């Protein structure tokens, strides 16, 4: 068919419309299996895969299961924190999603404190970048949930003005 033939234009338009709908349909895995799949996550690779498979379901009860998985991978899996580096470096979408989740004011103060303490005091050798990214995210969340933390007081009082003789 030739592009000037009206039937060709209609066929091309229908094809483009069908192709435009494919990515959206492929990205939307049903959320009814999300909780079960995410609940079994224990590694950084599995967490990244779960985010890609079910990130669109990250709300309501599924968000709670995602939070539990994140905490399980970071806190319980701290000895394997080195596995996070290559994944965070290669997968910007996962890195941004994780930073957003860790900086959420919905994360409990106890959990953010535990992640902060691990990142500050127990960062394995060579993992400074990963620890810094985790620390930065949870600190951002603390600042959002407790804005008074942003009101820093000077460490020493300002010097008194010099007296004129």
Where are these regions (language model features)?
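Extended amphipathic alpha-helical repeat scaffolds
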Residues: 43, 51, 87, 154-157
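N-terminal signal peptide c-region/cleavage motif recognized by signal peptidases
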Residues: 21-23
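Bacterial N-terminal signal peptides that target proteins for export
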Residues: 2-12
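Compositionally biased, proline/threonine/alanine/serine-rich low-complexity intrinsically disordered stretches
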Residues: 146-165
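Secretory pathway export signals and precursors
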Residues: 26-27, 53, 119, 127
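Extended alpha-helical scaffolding segments
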Residues: 59-149
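Hydrophobic helical h-region of N-terminal Sec-dependent signal peptides
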Residues: 13-17
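N-terminal secretory signal peptides
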Residues: 27-67
């Amino acid at each position: 068919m030739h592009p000037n033939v009206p039937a060709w234009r209609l066929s091309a338009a229908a094809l483009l419309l069908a192709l435009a709908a494919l990515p959206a349909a492929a990205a939307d895995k049903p959320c009814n299996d999300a909780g079960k799949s995410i609940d079994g996550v224990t590694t950084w690779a599995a967490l990244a895969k779960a985010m890609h498979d079910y990130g669109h379901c990250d709300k309501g009860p599924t968000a709670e299961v995602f939070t539990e998985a994140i905490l399980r991978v970071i806190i319980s899996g701290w000895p394997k924190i080195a596995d996070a580096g290559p994944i965070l470096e290669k997968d910007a979408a996962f890195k941004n999603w994780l930073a957003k989740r860790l900086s959420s004011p919905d994360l409990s103060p106890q959990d953010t404190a535990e992640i902060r303490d691990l990142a500050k005091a127990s960062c394995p050798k060579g993992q400074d970048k990963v620890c810094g990214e985790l620390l930065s995210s949870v600190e951002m969340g603390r600042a959002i949930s407790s804005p008074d933390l942003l009101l820093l007081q000077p460490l020493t009082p300002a010097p008194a003005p010099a007296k004129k003789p």
